[in-house]
């Protein structure tokens, strides 16, 4: 159900914010789930007003719970609700039903970037699912892909995109100008295994050697990405399989 999916999303969000090395404990997960159900139950009673729950609503519901674990979770979320990183604790002013939606994470600090990526990933998953039900394909473009793969949680998500979401009509494309960092990711092999279309522009010598070893490019093929005009950029483009 939509409520279960949202509960799962918020559990993983709290895991990112609160969990630490050991992750959320069973009691903490139970408390979060209870609060999510309560928040969405209250929202259901006011559907005509168009009210959408915010992270603030979960924060306040946690403060009303008797368990000390709830207090711990609420304290961790405070930074993102009433603290200096409360950017996402507001109703969106973006038309998310537009045919083209662009998320720009440039300039965000590391802590806020992780939260932003998690929220963006949830939106992509929901959009792909909704479009698939309506028989519509979803084209997703991920720029500066080597940066997105630095976070293990986000990297794992992109493996899911390349393996699973494409079966729901998602056509993901990744772009990067840093081949070394891209191929250093632990998850890149899984992504490359599910990619059958690549565009390679001119590459530095060290990058050409890495590409030749990693994806089996011949010397003759490498000759096409050896020379470039003055001012030209090095660019790599990956696209997942478009068919199951």
Which stretches of residues belong to each language-model region?
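Conserved beta-strand segments of the P-loop GTPase G domain that flank and frequently precede/overlap
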Residues: 104, 175-176, 201-202
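Conserved H-loop
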Residues: 170, 175-178
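Conserved AAA+ ATPase core "coupling" helix
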Residues: 207-211
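A short helix-turn-beta junction within AAA+ P-loop NTPase domains corresponding to the substrate/partner-engaging
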Residues: 189-200
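Conserved small helical "lid"/interfacial subdomain of P-loop NTPases
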Residues: 214-215
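Short acidic loop-to-helix transition motifs that present clustered carboxylates
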Residues: 179-182, 206
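P-loop NTPase motor domains
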Residues: 1-170, 183-186, 224, 233-238, ...
